[in-house]
Every structure is written in C-alpha cells, then in structure tokens.
Amino acid sequence: MTKQTILHLHPFCNKDNSDFIFLPAGIVGVINNLRKNYFKIISINVPLEMKLNPNKNIKEILKKINFKIVIIDCHWYYFLYGAQEIAKICKEINSECIVIVGGFSANFFRKEILKTSKNIDVIIKGDSESLMPDICKDLIYKGKNALTKFPNIIYKNRFGFIKDKKITYFDNNINKFDYIDITFMRHWKEYLQFSQGVKAPGISQIKKENEKFFYLPTQKGCQNSCPSCGGSKYSYKILSNKKEISVRSPTNIIKDIKKLKDLGIKKLMISGESNLNKWTYILKELKINKIFLNIIFEEWQLPKKEFVKQMISYAKNTDSGFIISALSGNEIIRIKNGKHFKNNKILEIAKIISKSENSYVSFWFAPNLVGATTKHFQETISFAKELLELNVLAPKPNIDVLIGPMEIDLTSYVYSNFSSFSLSEPVWNYKYFIDFLKTKPEGEKLGNMSFSSKHINIKQCNQLCEDFKNIILTMKENIEYFRGKKVYPLDKNLEIKDIEIKNYGVFLTILNKSNKNI
C-alpha cells in the first residue's frame, strides 16, 4: 500500500502567541496509530516552531508540503481561535484539503465552530485512535461523501446542514496504542527541552538545566465528579459518552518509562489514581531494574500508605513525590468538590513523608470552591498550618502547601450548569473566548475564569490567596530559623507534645517522660 501523507498541526493561540507548545496526550496515540496503518505523517508544532525561530513564516512552511488531509488538535480552550486560523491557512494553500479537528474544546463548541468557520470540515468526538485511520482512508479515496457512514463525528453535508452523529465507537483498551513516541513531530528533540513556565500553567519556556520533561498518560476517563474539572466523569460522559475509566497496564507503563529513559527523559509528570494502575508494583519494578527518573505524581484522590512508602523508597535515588489537591480544610466542602478523604487521613500521609529524608508532598488549596465561604477558608488556613508544622522537626522540610483560585474548566459540570450555582460573575461564552484569544499577549495567564459565588467573588478570592501566601511565608521563615538554630530536645526522655508557630517564634510543649529533672 502506498503511504498517503497526512499533515498534523498543533496550533498556536494566535499568530503572536507561542505559549502553549504541549501536545495533548490523546493526539500522540491517534498519530501513532495512523503511522501503524501505513500513513505518512508530517507533524508540525506551530508554537514550537515560533519559539525556535520567531521570524519563521508558518504559511511558507506549509506551502512546501503536499497534503490532502489536515488533522488539528484543539483539546484546551486556549486553541479555539488558533485552530481555526491554522485551518484557514491550510485552505488558502489547498482549497480542496479536508480539515479534521478533534479535542475536548472543539467537541464542546462543535456546533458554534461549524456555524462560523468555512475552513473546518469535520470535528471528531470521543475516542478516535482506531476510527481515524478508517476515516482518513475513505476520505482520500471516496471524498467527503464517505463521512455518512462514520459515528463520533459532526460535519456539514453537501446541502450545508450540520450532521451531528452519535458517539457509538470506543477505544477502551488503551494498551493497544502508543502515547509515548513523538519522533513523528518536527523538532521533537527540542520539544523535550521545554517545561512548564513559572507564570502560569501551559506557558512553556526552555529550561536552562538539562532535564527533559514528559507528561506520561496512564488513564483515560475519570471516576470522580469534581464539579469544576473539565476531565471529570461528567465531562467524559457528555463529550465521549464514556461511563468507565480506561487504564494502562503496569507492564505497559514500565515499558513506556523505559522508552522515555532511552530518549533522555529525566522528569515525568503523572496524573491519575495510583491504585488503578498498581503504582506500588510499578515503582518496585522500576527500582529493581534501576530505572530512575524524577516522578511528580498528581494524585486525584489520596495515595494509599503502601504507595507512599514505596515512593519514599524510590525517592532515595530520585527527586520524586506527590501533588495532592486537598482543596479545603473543611471536610464537607472537600467532598462537595469531589475529594473523598478526611483531614486525619491527609495528616497520616503527610506524617509518613515528613518522617522520611526522601520524597515530598505539596498540598494544593483554593478559597473559591463550590459551597465555600470565607469562614471555611479560615479552616483551610488552620489546616495548612498544621501540615506545614510537620517541617519543624522533620529530617528535611518536605511538606509544602500551595494556594490558587479554582478555575472553571470549559467542559466541567459547573460551566454547563452555571445557573445552578448562583455565580456572581458570568462564565465566558464562545464569542468571548474567540475575542479574548485573538489578541491574548504572549507570556501572560490564560485569564481568570474563576469559580465566583455570592460568598466569594473573584476579587475576594485573589485577596484570600494573597493572605494565605503571606501567612505561609511567615511560617516558613520561622520554621527555617528554628531549624537553623537546631533547638531540638536531645535527651531521649523528652518528647515534643505540641508545636505552635506564631509570628514571633516557635513554641514547644515538651513532656519529660523520666522521674529526674532535666
């Protein structure tokens, strides 16, 4: 079979903004399955090309490529405008090309996009790894009329009417696909040198140190119902018709990590529920086989103690640890926002890590949660201080607490049902997104679509975040001073029963367990 060329484009935000170079995990699996089915792929990461050479003319690059089918990923809302602009450029070069767009944001606004854009032919919904080769093959040999037979798509028929087909096709076995190999992409080696920027998520910048970074996908779907999250159980139901989560096997994850190590990757980001992939076993195997990378594990719920202890063991040779969204110090508010664990369980995990000289954990909180008030946030501050106090006598200060506004994801339950939440600020509609992204400057935050209720508006939320940061900074300074002075009770008969950190010092309650004066 003669290989047919398919052009894949990762879009910019706008022609002057190259911030978000990172590929969605799903498109890597889609492209690699096309390659497996004998398609030739030319993949260009447009914002990456802009970063590497700001003077490059993207249109001139594309003119040199003979393409009939273009695939554009549009997973995050950041690309809603840019994906359409890139499609327009492709149509200007080859008016007969067929442009396919996929991803959660394109899916969510699929009707708005097709009504307003003349340059996008098909938007694919739900799973597309196995479906895409069949769609591309029929489009190449039969043209757009072939679209009538396929599920999971929306398109305009020859009369200009929008046909929104049902999602009936699923790729539930994600062990069949390759989400690791990105060598199909132009300048993939340079891509691996980029890491998350310090200003905001997604704003990428070249790291000065030589630590190649990779986000490792291990799960598709979610079994949690966090109301503000765009990747929740609700989100997958409305956008992919998925009712169950798909997980990658431990064997395949270990193989993936071996491949990444061979590519020179030093740092992995993993996001999911560790018990679903048996991560305790995975880390044991990695350690036995001396496969050591720095792992940041973003745990969607709370890791099991066995996994925490195994991470501590693995971290003897690496800088590996956890990020956990504790969200609130109030347990009822935490549960309302999709996290089903209590304060005492958080403290148990924190104490295990605190007693070790390895690993770390960062707990993330937010003031503007569903159902939360300023009173609840005072509980959050108190609980965050209790966690941070563990650093006073720890072998090393490896407990951290972070704060930030809870953003409303585009594809979340809150966004789709905003009238039920008495929001004090309107959510952004499609037109607002397009107008905002069209002129968004490079290097700045995406925006502030924070959850804003009658209890905590955006201005109050931002101020509460600043108050939290100042309180925690003062605590950290006091802890650092205390640790530097090393004023620990050295006698084995003395036991610290209580620690209280105030603005002017660290106060200890010490129990003398002996009958003698010490």
Indicate residue ranges for each PLM-predicted region:
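Glycine- and acidic-residue-enriched helix-capping/strand-helix junction motifs
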Residues: 15-27
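Flexible glycine/acidic-rich beta-alpha junction loops that bind and position SAM and/or redox cofactors
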Residues: 16-17, 224, 237, 279, ...
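Radical SAM enzyme core and accessory elements
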Residues: 1-8, 59-68, 158, 434-518
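Glycine-rich beta-alpha loop elements in corrinoid/cobalamin-binding modules
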Residues: 42-172
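N-terminal [4Fe-4S]-dependent radical SAM core
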Residues: 7, 14, 156-218
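Conserved SAM/AdoMet-binding glycine-rich loop
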Residues: 2-9, 13-16, 69, 100, ...
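Canonical Radical SAM [4Fe-4S] cluster-binding loop centered on the CxxxCxxC motif
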Residues: 203-249
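Catalytic cores of alpha/beta
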Residues: 112-116, 371-386
